[in-house]
Swiss-Prot record:
The keyword Nucleotide-binding applies. Residues 136-157 are annotated as: Disordered. The gene is hslU. It is found in: Cytoplasm. GO terms for cellular component: HslUV protease complex. It comes from Shewanella baltica (strain OS185). Keywords: ATP-binding, Chaperone, Cytoplasm, Nucleotide-binding, Stress response. This is ATP-dependent protease ATPase subunit HslU.
Length: 442
């Protein structure tokens, strides 16, 4: 897992997300606390439970982006899910326990990559021997089986050429394991164990024998390394480590949690809102979930929930779930200055993306300071007058602004454009000032 300090985590998030320091600090501390907990004695460690987070803020201010960037920094099993995708147990739709099953699958993949990385050197040696065997087949007759000095020397010559890349383009016939055909079975509620057993049965039935293929040595070497590394990984140890990783370091990001709040007085079962909240309770509090890899305890999994709460309030969540999300963080609405920073400061910012895209056609595009100010102001004004969709408004405004250049770029190779205040005014003023037009076009 990540050993980064909270300050380092915030610094990494700053490279991609403008503002929202409170939210960044909260997730940074939560991530660091995962590491701190693992430094404690085993007995005391069990008593330290994660403090789950609820992020509240309007749409388009960076809630989901924080989750995306955090996933890359965490170096731990991480899953982002939309709360609206789930229904109460017993009804058609996904059950919330599927979150933990998917998280376990992610952990299996992560652990497999780590273990295969550790035994990569041995896998390369085995792959090298298999390629040399294909290049220099061993004699089939028993009386010729003793390796002579000349054949040994020839093998060493070919080994040297192989390592230097001189044989990369040479084609060989080699036996390569066939990919397994997966069978997806939709399981009825409460019958996941039977479904897993059926899937295992089909998986074993569908194992095809190795197929002889003709390919270049460079391609064959990559395939054989993967194949040999997979053979060296102990599957039982892999499952144990993955489950341990989920239980101790797993992070679940629940997006759009405000959409499962109960709205007004409704009669009948609310299976996709309050029902989902009730099902989430044991998951967030701590329970045991059955997966095809084994039993997974959720007691120490960190849950980060987020929602815009425009049509509802955090207090509309059922009280038990509110209590299980003790840390509340409010994200601020974006100002015109924030828009300006979003256009220029982050790594691979929106302006940099358009400059790079047009450069592929031989067209040089430059954004002046006044142009960036005007774009930011236009996006902010449209947000204020119509629906506030946050930074996503910049994508709409920029696409409309660059529409003519993008369309004609292939015919204007070698030309240059400067996007200044006058250019922005000429292309956007009518749309921004006309509220009806901006509602439909921007």
């Amino acid at each position: 897992m990540s050993e980064m300090t909270p300050r380092e985590i915030v610094h990494e998030l700053d490279a991609h997300i403008i503002g929202q320091q409170k939210a960044k600090r909260s997730v940074a501390v939560a991530l660091r606390n995962r590491w701190r907990r693992m430094q404690l004695d085993a007995d005391f460690r069990q008593e330290v439970t994660p403090k789950n987070i609820l992020m509240i803020g309007p749409t388009g201010v960076g809630k989901t982006e924080i989750a995306r960037r955090l996933a890359k920094l965490a170096n731990a099993p991480f899953i982002k899910v939309e709360a609206t995708k789930f229904t109460e147990v017993g009804y058609v739709g996904k059950e919330v326990e599927q979150i933990i099953r998917d998280l376990t699958d992610i952990a299996i993949k992560l652990t497999r990559e780590q273990q295969m990385g550790k035994c990569r050197q041995r896998a390369e040696e085995h792959a090298e021997e298999r390629i040399l065997d294909a290049l220099l087949p061993k004699p089939k007759n028993d009386w010729e089986s003793t390796e002579t000095d000349s054949s040994s020397n020839t093998r060493q010559v070919f080994r040297k050429k192989l390592r230097e890349g001189q044989l990369d383009d040479k084609e060989i016939d080699i036996d390569v394991a066939q990919p397994q055909i997966g069978v997806e079975i939709m399981s009825p509620p409460g019958m996941e164990e039977m479904t897993n057993q059926l899937q295992s049965l089909f998986k074993n039935m569908g194992q095809a024998p190795a197929k002889r293929r003709k390919m270049k040595i460079k391609e064959a070497f990559k395939l054989l390394i993967e194949e040999e590394a997979a053979k060296l990984v102990n599957q039982e140890d892999l499952k144990e480590q993955a489950i341990e990783m989920v239980e101790q370091h797993g992070i679940v990001f629940l997006d759009e949690i405000d959409k499962i709040c109960k709205r007004g007085e409704t009669s009948g079962p609310d299976v996709s809102r309050e029902g989902v909240q009730r099902d989430l309770l044991p998951l967030v509090e701590g329970c045991t979930v059955t997966t095809k890899h084994g039993m997974v305890k959720t007691d120490h999994i960190l849950f980060i929930a987020s929602g815009a709460f425009q049509m509802s309030k955090p207090s509309d969540l059922i009280p038990e779930l509110q209590g299980r999300l003790p840390i509340r963080v409010e994200l601020d609405a974006l100002s015109a200055d924030d828009f300006k920073r979003i256009l220029t400061e982050p790594h691979a910012s929106l302006t940099e993306q358009y400059i790079a895209l047009m450069n592929t056609e031989g067209v040089k595009v430059e954004f002046s300071e006044s142009g960036i100010d005007s774009i930011a102001k236009a996006a902010w004004q449209v947000n204020e007058r119509t629906e506030n969709i946050g930074a996503r408004r910049l994508h709409t405004v920029m696409e409309k602004l660059m529409e003519d250049i993008s369309y004609e770029a292939s015919e204007k190779s070698g030309s240059a454009f400067v996007i200044d205040a006058d250019y922005v005014s000429a292309h956007l003023d009518n749309l921004v000032q006309d509220e009806d037009l901006s509602r439909f076009i921007l």
